[in-house]
Amino acid sequence: MNIHEYQAKAVLREFGVPVSHGYPIFKASEAEAAATKLGGPVWVVKSQIHAGGRGKGKFKEASAGDKGGVRLAKSVDEVKTYAEQMLHATLVTVQTGPAGKQVNRLYIEEGSEIDKEFYLSLLVDRATSRISFVVSTEGGMSIEDVAHDTPEKIVSFTVDPATGIMSHHGRAVANALGLKGDQAKQAESLVTKLYTAFLAKDMEMLEINPLVLTKQGDLKCLDAKMSFDGNSLYRHADIQGLRDESEEDAKEIEASKYDLNYVTLDGTIGCMVNGAGLAMATMDIIKLYGMTPANFLDVGGGASKEKVTAAFKIITADPNVKGILINIFGGIMKCDIIAEGVVAAVKEVGLDVPLVVRLEGTNVEAGKKIIKHSGLNVLPADNLDDAAQKIVNAVKGA
Protein backbone atom coordinates (compact mmCIF):
# COMPACT_ATOMS: atom_id res chain seq x y z
CA MET A 1 0.00 0.00 0.00
CA ASN A 2 1.27 3.47 -0.92
CA ILE A 3 0.65 6.74 0.88
CA HIS A 4 1.09 10.42 0.03
CA GLU A 5 4.26 12.41 0.65
CA TYR A 6 2.80 14.49 3.48
CA GLN A 7 1.59 11.32 5.20
CA ALA A 8 5.01 9.69 4.79
CA LYS A 9 6.67 12.73 6.35
CA ALA A 10 4.28 12.57 9.29
CA VAL A 11 5.33 8.95 9.85
CA LEU A 12 9.01 9.92 9.66
CA ARG A 13 8.43 12.77 12.09
CA GLU A 14 7.22 10.23 14.67
CA PHE A 15 10.69 8.69 14.60
CA GLY A 16 12.57 11.99 14.85
CA VAL A 17 13.59 12.12 11.19
CA PRO A 18 14.29 15.71 10.01
CA VAL A 19 11.64 16.83 7.51
CA SER A 20 10.34 20.24 6.46
CA HIS A 21 7.26 21.70 8.10
CA GLY A 22 4.13 21.79 6.00
CA TYR A 23 0.35 21.49 5.85
CA PRO A 24 -1.86 19.45 3.52
CA ILE A 25 -4.81 21.25 1.96
CA PHE A 26 -7.87 19.88 0.19
CA LYS A 27 -9.45 23.18 -0.88
CA ALA A 28 -7.85 26.24 -2.48
CA SER A 29 -9.40 28.37 0.26
CA GLU A 30 -7.11 26.64 2.79
CA ALA A 31 -3.91 27.74 1.03
CA GLU A 32 -3.62 31.20 2.60
CA ALA A 33 -3.92 29.92 6.16
CA ALA A 34 -1.34 27.19 5.54
CA ALA A 35 1.15 29.61 3.99
CA THR A 36 0.62 32.16 6.76
CA LYS A 37 1.25 29.58 9.49
CA LEU A 38 4.51 28.55 7.81
CA GLY A 39 5.62 32.15 7.59
CA GLY A 40 7.71 32.11 4.42
CA PRO A 41 9.50 33.83 2.80
CA VAL A 42 9.52 30.89 0.38
CA TRP A 43 6.98 28.08 0.06
CA VAL A 44 6.76 24.93 -2.05
CA VAL A 45 3.35 23.88 -3.40
CA LYS A 46 3.38 20.13 -4.05
CA SER A 47 0.81 18.00 -5.86
CA GLN A 48 -0.06 14.90 -3.84
CA ILE A 49 -0.52 11.88 -6.09
CA HIS A 50 0.81 8.32 -5.95
CA ALA A 51 3.32 8.80 -8.76
CA GLY A 52 6.84 10.10 -9.20
CA GLY A 53 8.10 12.76 -11.59
CA ARG A 54 5.70 15.40 -10.27
CA GLY A 55 8.11 18.29 -10.65
CA LYS A 56 8.69 17.62 -14.34
CA GLY A 57 5.07 16.69 -14.99
CA LYS A 58 2.57 18.78 -16.92
CA PHE A 59 -1.08 19.49 -16.29
CA LYS A 60 -3.59 18.67 -19.00
CA GLU A 61 -5.70 21.75 -18.36
CA ALA A 62 -4.50 25.10 -19.69
CA SER A 63 -6.03 26.76 -16.64
CA ALA A 64 -3.45 24.99 -14.46
CA GLY A 65 -0.61 26.89 -16.10
CA ASP A 66 2.50 25.56 -17.79
CA LYS A 67 4.52 24.80 -14.66
CA GLY A 68 4.87 21.32 -13.18
CA GLY A 69 3.31 19.61 -10.20
CA VAL A 70 5.81 21.06 -7.70
CA ARG A 71 6.02 24.86 -7.66
CA LEU A 72 8.09 27.42 -5.77
CA ALA A 73 6.11 30.38 -4.42
CA LYS A 74 7.59 33.63 -3.11
CA SER A 75 4.44 35.18 -1.66
CA VAL A 76 1.22 34.09 0.02
CA ASP A 77 -0.72 35.33 -3.01
CA GLU A 78 1.40 33.12 -5.26
CA VAL A 79 0.66 30.13 -3.02
CA LYS A 80 -3.06 30.89 -3.34
CA THR A 81 -2.82 31.22 -7.13
CA TYR A 82 -0.97 27.92 -7.51
CA ALA A 83 -3.47 26.15 -5.26
CA GLU A 84 -6.37 27.42 -7.37
CA GLN A 85 -4.63 26.28 -10.56
CA MET A 86 -3.43 22.86 -9.40
CA LEU A 87 -6.25 21.47 -7.26
CA HIS A 88 -8.57 19.14 -9.22
CA ALA A 89 -6.43 19.47 -12.36
CA THR A 90 -4.95 16.40 -14.08
CA LEU A 91 -1.21 15.92 -13.73
CA VAL A 92 0.65 13.77 -16.26
CA THR A 93 4.06 12.40 -15.27
CA VAL A 94 6.38 9.68 -16.53
CA GLN A 95 4.74 7.31 -14.03
CA THR A 96 1.05 8.14 -14.50
CA GLY A 97 0.81 7.31 -18.19
CA PRO A 98 -0.93 9.63 -20.66
CA ALA A 99 -4.20 9.59 -18.71
CA GLY A 100 -2.57 11.34 -15.75
CA LYS A 101 -3.98 11.62 -12.24
CA GLN A 102 -6.29 14.19 -10.73
CA VAL A 103 -4.72 16.25 -7.95
CA ASN A 104 -7.17 16.25 -5.05
CA ARG A 105 -4.80 17.46 -2.35
CA LEU A 106 -1.72 19.66 -2.09
CA TYR A 107 1.10 19.93 0.42
CA ILE A 108 2.19 23.48 1.29
CA GLU A 109 5.71 23.23 2.66
CA GLU A 110 8.34 25.66 3.87
CA GLY A 111 11.17 26.31 1.43
CA SER A 112 14.72 25.10 2.08
CA GLU A 113 18.08 26.58 1.16
CA ILE A 114 19.71 23.63 -0.58
CA ASP A 115 23.45 23.14 -0.82
CA LYS A 116 23.56 19.53 -2.07
CA GLU A 117 21.06 16.85 -3.07
CA PHE A 118 21.46 13.13 -2.40
CA TYR A 119 19.49 9.92 -2.91
CA LEU A 120 18.75 7.45 -0.11
CA SER A 121 16.35 4.52 -0.02
CA LEU A 122 15.59 1.39 1.95
CA LEU A 123 13.92 -1.64 0.45
CA VAL A 124 13.42 -5.33 1.01
CA ASP A 125 16.10 -7.28 -0.85
CA ARG A 126 14.31 -10.50 -1.84
CA ALA A 127 17.56 -12.21 -2.81
CA THR A 128 19.12 -11.89 0.65
CA SER A 129 15.96 -11.54 2.78
CA ARG A 130 17.46 -8.41 4.27
CA ILE A 131 16.80 -4.68 4.25
CA SER A 132 18.99 -2.98 1.69
CA PHE A 133 20.21 0.63 1.65
CA VAL A 134 20.74 2.33 -1.71
CA VAL A 135 22.72 5.58 -1.64
CA SER A 136 23.86 8.03 -4.31
CA THR A 137 25.32 11.52 -4.58
CA GLU A 138 22.98 12.07 -7.53
CA GLY A 139 19.84 13.18 -5.72
CA GLY A 140 16.75 14.71 -7.28
CA MET A 141 17.08 12.45 -10.32
CA SER A 142 15.53 9.15 -11.34
CA ILE A 143 17.66 6.48 -9.69
CA GLU A 144 16.99 4.26 -12.71
CA ASP A 145 18.70 6.85 -14.93
CA VAL A 146 21.65 7.07 -12.55
CA ALA A 147 21.96 3.27 -12.50
CA HIS A 148 21.98 3.22 -16.30
CA ASP A 149 24.27 6.19 -16.98
CA THR A 150 26.62 6.30 -13.98
CA PRO A 151 26.26 3.09 -11.94
CA GLU A 152 29.51 3.83 -10.13
CA LYS A 153 27.70 6.66 -8.30
CA ILE A 154 25.41 4.20 -6.51
CA VAL A 155 26.42 2.43 -3.29
CA SER A 156 24.28 -0.31 -1.74
CA PHE A 157 24.57 -2.64 1.22
CA THR A 158 22.31 -4.88 3.29
CA VAL A 159 21.76 -5.05 7.05
CA ASP A 160 22.09 -8.37 8.85
CA PRO A 161 18.83 -8.81 10.82
CA ALA A 162 20.74 -10.68 13.53
CA THR A 163 22.73 -7.57 14.44
CA GLY A 164 20.35 -4.89 13.21
CA ILE A 165 21.44 -1.40 12.30
CA MET A 166 24.90 -0.44 13.60
CA SER A 167 27.08 2.65 13.56
CA HIS A 168 29.19 1.37 10.68
CA HIS A 169 26.11 1.38 8.46
CA GLY A 170 25.69 5.08 9.14
CA ARG A 171 29.37 5.67 8.41
CA ALA A 172 28.99 3.79 5.12
CA VAL A 173 26.21 6.18 4.09
CA ALA A 174 28.22 9.22 5.20
CA ASN A 175 31.28 8.04 3.26
CA ALA A 176 29.21 7.35 0.15
CA LEU A 177 27.81 10.88 0.28
CA GLY A 178 31.12 12.53 1.12
CA LEU A 179 29.94 13.81 4.50
CA LYS A 180 32.41 14.67 7.27
CA GLY A 181 32.35 15.79 10.89
CA ASP A 182 28.97 16.83 12.26
CA GLN A 183 27.25 16.01 8.97
CA ALA A 184 28.59 12.45 9.16
CA LYS A 185 27.14 12.16 12.68
CA GLN A 186 23.81 13.43 11.35
CA ALA A 187 23.93 10.75 8.66
CA GLU A 188 24.54 8.03 11.27
CA SER A 189 21.57 9.23 13.32
CA LEU A 190 19.36 9.50 10.23
CA VAL A 191 20.20 5.98 9.04
CA THR A 192 19.31 4.51 12.44
CA LYS A 193 15.99 6.36 12.57
CA LEU A 194 15.01 5.39 9.03
CA TYR A 195 15.83 1.73 9.65
CA THR A 196 13.85 1.77 12.91
CA ALA A 197 10.84 3.31 11.15
CA PHE A 198 11.11 0.83 8.27
CA LEU A 199 10.96 -2.15 10.64
CA ALA A 200 8.36 -0.74 13.01
CA LYS A 201 5.87 0.03 10.24
CA ASP A 202 6.50 -3.05 8.07
CA MET A 203 7.51 -1.02 5.04
CA GLU A 204 8.47 -2.55 1.71
CA MET A 205 10.12 0.59 0.38
CA LEU A 206 11.18 3.98 1.75
CA GLU A 207 12.68 6.43 -0.72
CA ILE A 208 14.13 9.83 0.16
CA ASN A 209 14.78 11.70 -3.08
CA PRO A 210 16.19 14.13 -2.50
CA LEU A 211 17.86 13.97 0.86
CA VAL A 212 19.38 17.45 1.06
CA LEU A 213 22.21 19.16 2.85
CA THR A 214 21.00 22.69 3.59
CA LYS A 215 23.20 25.76 3.49
CA GLN A 216 22.93 25.75 7.29
CA GLY A 217 24.71 22.37 7.29
CA ASP A 218 21.72 20.21 8.20
CA LEU A 219 20.50 16.99 6.58
CA LYS A 220 16.80 17.01 5.74
CA CYS A 221 14.41 14.65 3.94
CA LEU A 222 12.91 16.89 1.27
CA ASP A 223 10.70 14.19 -0.25
CA ALA A 224 9.51 10.81 0.96
CA LYS A 225 7.82 7.85 -0.69
CA MET A 226 6.58 4.89 1.34
CA SER A 227 5.15 1.52 0.44
CA PHE A 228 3.85 -0.92 3.05
CA ASP A 229 3.49 -4.70 3.11
CA GLY A 230 -0.23 -5.28 2.59
CA ASN A 231 -0.04 -8.54 4.57
CA SER A 232 0.94 -6.61 7.70
CA LEU A 233 -1.71 -3.90 7.64
CA TYR A 234 -3.92 -5.76 10.12
CA ARG A 235 -1.48 -4.71 12.84
CA HIS A 236 -1.12 -1.10 11.67
CA ALA A 237 -4.52 0.56 11.98
CA ASP A 238 -2.83 3.96 11.79
CA ILE A 239 -1.33 3.14 8.40
CA GLN A 240 -4.56 1.62 7.10
CA GLY A 241 -6.25 4.92 7.90
CA LEU A 242 -3.92 6.69 5.46
CA ARG A 243 -5.16 4.74 2.44
CA ASP A 244 -6.43 6.90 -0.43
CA GLU A 245 -8.62 4.69 -2.60
CA SER A 246 -9.03 7.45 -5.19
CA GLU A 247 -5.37 6.83 -6.10
CA GLU A 248 -5.94 3.11 -6.67
CA ASP A 249 -7.49 1.19 -9.54
CA ALA A 250 -11.21 0.70 -8.81
CA LYS A 251 -11.12 -2.84 -10.22
CA GLU A 252 -8.22 -3.79 -7.96
CA ILE A 253 -10.08 -2.43 -4.94
CA GLU A 254 -13.16 -4.46 -5.85
CA ALA A 255 -11.02 -7.58 -6.37
CA SER A 256 -9.46 -7.20 -2.92
CA LYS A 257 -12.93 -7.45 -1.35
CA TYR A 258 -13.15 -11.02 -2.67
CA ASP A 259 -9.49 -11.92 -1.96
CA LEU A 260 -8.78 -12.05 -5.68
CA ASN A 261 -5.25 -11.38 -6.89
CA TYR A 262 -5.93 -8.85 -9.65
CA VAL A 263 -3.60 -6.44 -11.44
CA THR A 264 -4.68 -4.19 -14.30
CA LEU A 265 -2.49 -4.34 -17.41
CA ASP A 266 -2.68 -2.46 -20.70
CA GLY A 267 -3.71 -5.22 -23.12
CA THR A 268 -7.03 -6.40 -24.59
CA ILE A 269 -7.39 -10.07 -23.54
CA GLY A 270 -8.97 -10.56 -20.13
CA CYS A 271 -7.67 -13.57 -18.18
CA MET A 272 -9.15 -15.63 -15.35
CA VAL A 273 -6.81 -18.33 -14.07
CA ASN A 274 -6.24 -20.30 -10.87
CA GLY A 275 -2.66 -20.16 -9.63
CA ALA A 276 -0.06 -17.42 -10.12
CA GLY A 277 2.28 -19.62 -12.16
CA LEU A 278 -0.45 -20.74 -14.55
CA ALA A 279 -1.65 -17.14 -14.80
CA MET A 280 1.80 -15.95 -15.87
CA ALA A 281 2.11 -18.82 -18.35
CA THR A 282 -1.29 -17.86 -19.77
CA MET A 283 -0.20 -14.25 -20.22
CA ASP A 284 3.03 -15.39 -21.86
CA ILE A 285 1.27 -17.55 -24.45
CA ILE A 286 -1.17 -14.74 -25.28
CA LYS A 287 1.89 -12.58 -26.02
CA LEU A 288 3.39 -15.43 -28.03
CA TYR A 289 0.41 -15.39 -30.37
CA GLY A 290 0.56 -11.66 -30.93
CA MET A 291 -1.73 -10.01 -28.38
CA THR A 292 -1.39 -8.68 -24.83
CA PRO A 293 -3.25 -9.51 -21.59
CA ALA A 294 -5.56 -6.93 -20.04
CA ASN A 295 -5.01 -8.20 -16.52
CA PHE A 296 -3.46 -10.69 -14.16
CA LEU A 297 -6.23 -12.49 -12.25
CA ASP A 298 -5.64 -15.45 -9.96
CA VAL A 299 -8.89 -16.68 -8.40
CA GLY A 300 -6.97 -18.97 -6.03
CA GLY A 301 -7.47 -22.59 -5.14
CA GLY A 302 -10.71 -22.47 -3.16
CA ALA A 303 -12.90 -20.02 -5.04
CA SER A 304 -16.66 -20.18 -4.66
CA LYS A 305 -19.28 -19.62 -7.34
CA GLU A 306 -19.77 -16.08 -5.99
CA LYS A 307 -16.04 -15.38 -6.14
CA VAL A 308 -15.83 -16.53 -9.76
CA THR A 309 -18.85 -14.41 -10.65
CA ALA A 310 -17.21 -11.37 -9.05
CA ALA A 311 -13.98 -12.05 -10.95
CA PHE A 312 -15.82 -12.22 -14.26
CA LYS A 313 -17.63 -8.95 -13.54
CA ILE A 314 -14.32 -7.23 -12.77
CA ILE A 315 -12.84 -8.39 -16.09
CA THR A 316 -15.85 -7.25 -18.12
CA ALA A 317 -15.84 -3.86 -16.37
CA ASP A 318 -12.62 -3.02 -18.23
CA PRO A 319 -13.57 -1.25 -21.50
CA ASN A 320 -10.26 -2.30 -23.06
CA VAL A 321 -11.14 -6.00 -22.89
CA LYS A 322 -11.94 -7.36 -26.36
CA GLY A 323 -11.89 -11.04 -25.45
CA ILE A 324 -11.71 -13.28 -22.37
CA LEU A 325 -9.70 -16.45 -21.75
CA ILE A 326 -10.57 -18.63 -18.76
CA ASN A 327 -7.88 -21.20 -18.03
CA ILE A 328 -8.53 -23.50 -15.07
CA PHE A 329 -6.57 -26.54 -13.94
CA GLY A 330 -8.77 -28.03 -11.24
CA GLY A 331 -7.02 -29.44 -8.22
CA ILE A 332 -8.53 -28.00 -5.08
CA MET A 333 -10.54 -25.76 -7.39
CA LYS A 334 -13.33 -27.76 -9.04
CA CYS A 335 -14.11 -27.17 -12.71
CA ASP A 336 -17.88 -27.36 -12.18
CA ILE A 337 -17.70 -24.50 -9.65
CA ILE A 338 -15.83 -22.38 -12.20
CA ALA A 339 -18.38 -23.26 -14.86
CA GLU A 340 -21.33 -22.35 -12.63
CA GLY A 341 -19.73 -19.02 -11.73
CA VAL A 342 -19.00 -18.14 -15.36
CA VAL A 343 -22.51 -19.03 -16.50
CA ALA A 344 -24.07 -17.00 -13.66
CA ALA A 345 -21.88 -13.99 -14.41
CA VAL A 346 -22.52 -14.02 -18.16
CA LYS A 347 -26.27 -14.26 -17.63
CA GLU A 348 -26.12 -11.35 -15.18
CA VAL A 349 -23.84 -8.91 -17.00
CA GLY A 350 -24.10 -10.13 -20.59
CA LEU A 351 -21.26 -10.97 -22.94
CA ASP A 352 -20.27 -8.71 -25.82
CA VAL A 353 -16.80 -10.16 -26.46
CA PRO A 354 -15.49 -13.62 -27.42
CA LEU A 355 -15.02 -16.07 -24.52
CA VAL A 356 -12.74 -19.11 -24.60
CA VAL A 357 -12.80 -21.60 -21.72
CA ARG A 358 -10.20 -24.26 -21.07
CA LEU A 359 -10.98 -26.61 -18.18
CA GLU A 360 -8.88 -29.52 -16.95
CA GLY A 361 -8.74 -31.50 -13.72
CA THR A 362 -11.25 -32.16 -10.94
CA ASN A 363 -14.86 -32.47 -12.19
CA VAL A 364 -13.80 -31.37 -15.67
CA GLU A 365 -16.54 -33.31 -17.47
CA ALA A 366 -19.21 -31.83 -15.21
CA GLY A 367 -17.80 -28.36 -15.85
CA LYS A 368 -17.78 -28.80 -19.62
CA LYS A 369 -21.33 -30.13 -19.50
CA ILE A 370 -22.55 -27.07 -17.57
CA ILE A 371 -21.04 -24.71 -20.13
CA LYS A 372 -22.22 -26.78 -23.11
CA HIS A 373 -25.84 -26.78 -21.93
CA SER A 374 -25.84 -23.13 -20.80
CA GLY A 375 -26.82 -21.84 -24.22
CA LEU A 376 -23.95 -19.34 -24.10
CA ASN A 377 -21.68 -18.59 -27.03
CA VAL A 378 -18.52 -20.03 -25.49
CA LEU A 379 -15.55 -21.48 -27.37
CA PRO A 380 -14.19 -24.61 -25.61
CA ALA A 381 -10.46 -25.37 -25.75
CA ASP A 382 -8.62 -28.64 -25.24
CA ASN A 383 -5.33 -27.26 -23.93
CA LEU A 384 -3.54 -23.97 -23.22
CA ASP A 385 -2.03 -23.64 -26.69
CA ASP A 386 -5.41 -24.26 -28.31
CA ALA A 387 -7.08 -21.79 -25.94
CA ALA A 388 -4.59 -19.00 -26.68
CA GLN A 389 -4.87 -19.43 -30.44
CA LYS A 390 -8.67 -19.47 -30.29
CA ILE A 391 -9.01 -16.27 -28.23
CA VAL A 392 -6.45 -14.40 -30.33
CA ASN A 393 -8.12 -15.46 -33.58
CA ALA A 394 -11.57 -14.65 -32.21
CA VAL A 395 -10.54 -11.14 -31.17
CA LYS A 396 -8.75 -10.45 -34.44
CA GLY A 397 -11.76 -11.69 -36.38
CA ALA A 398 -14.33 -9.79 -34.33
UniProtKB/Swiss-Prot annotation:
Q: How does it assemble?
A: Heterotetramer of two alpha and two beta subunits.
What this protein needs as a cofactor is: Mg(2+)
Going by the UniProt record, its keywords in alphabetical order are:
ATP-binding, Ligase, Magnesium, Metal-binding, Nucleotide-binding, Tricarboxylic acid cycle
Q: Which GO terms describe its cellular component?
A: cytosol; succinate-CoA ligase complex
NCBIfam families (UniProt xref): PRK00696.1 (NF001913), sucCoAbeta (TIGR01016)
Drop me one GO molecular function for this one: succinate-CoA ligase (ADP-forming) activity
Question: Function of this protein?
Answer: Succinyl-CoA synthetase functions in the citric acid cycle (TCA), coupling the hydrolysis of succinyl-CoA to the synthesis of either ATP or GTP and thus represents the only step of substrate-level phosphorylation in the TCA. The beta subunit provides nucleotide specificity of the enzyme and binds the substrate succinate, while the binding sites for coenzyme A and phosphate are found in the alpha subunit.
Membrane-crossing segments per the record: none
State the protein's name. Answer: Succinate--CoA ligase [ADP-forming] subunit beta
Where ATP is bound, by residue? Answer: K46, G53, R54, G55, E109, S112, E117
Q: Which reaction does it catalyse?
A: succinate + ATP + CoA = succinyl-CoA + ADP + phosphate; GTP + succinate + CoA = succinyl-CoA + GDP + phosphate
